[in-house]
Amino acid sequence: MDDVTPDELEAVSVLLRLPNPVFFDQEEEEEDEEEEYDEESVCEDDLEVKSCMQTNENKGKKRKVAEQLMDSDVKDNQYRLMLGKEPVKKMMDALGKTEKLGTKGLNVSVYGPNGENHKMVLKIWIKGTPVLTSGWKNFVKSYKLEKHVDFLTIWMFRHKKTREICFAIDSTRFPVKGTLSKRILQEVFKNP
């Protein structure tokens, strides 16, 4: 570990002491009854977060994406969250039939750390980079997210009732002064 900075060592020691995020499975059969619900106040019983994080070749292993927020993710003139191509592709494949994003993108619900629903748009840029836009700025402000110190854990799933693609994002703040190396992030978070 000769090429690791003191900041990275400190961050790794803090990150490795964290418990794994809690995942929950919904194994109950859906009932055929029609019921109305308020999309703004959806409880976790209405969300289906089971095999959405699995890839076909890794059945049983839940998937999440963890990212350190960068300057461009919170910058006033940009305000979009860039997501990794491969992890998002694996999660989309695991969700089965996928909607076409088209040039306008796909409207998605993003549930924040407090369970609040934020409307955003998932787009794929020209080089294939997935981004969350149109609402990301408010999300950043709502949770007072900052570059480098905030790390996001992102889950992707289908809503149990609407079957629409949704995201759940949790944030954890660490005493980090700069960007951690990709190698350290991959080791700590074990991104797919």
Swiss-Prot record:
Residues 25-44 have a biased composition (Acidic residues). Keywords: DNA-binding, Nucleus, Transcription, Transcription regulation. GO terms for cellular component: nucleus. Residues 75-173 bind DNA. One of its GO terms (molecular function) is DNA binding. Its main location: nucleus. Signal peptide: none annotated. Residues 22-44 are annotated as: Disordered. The keyword Transcription regulation applies. InterPro entries: At2g31720-like, B3_DNA-bd, DNA-bd_pseudobarrel_sf. This is Putative B3 domain-containing protein At4g03160. It comes from Arabidopsis thaliana.
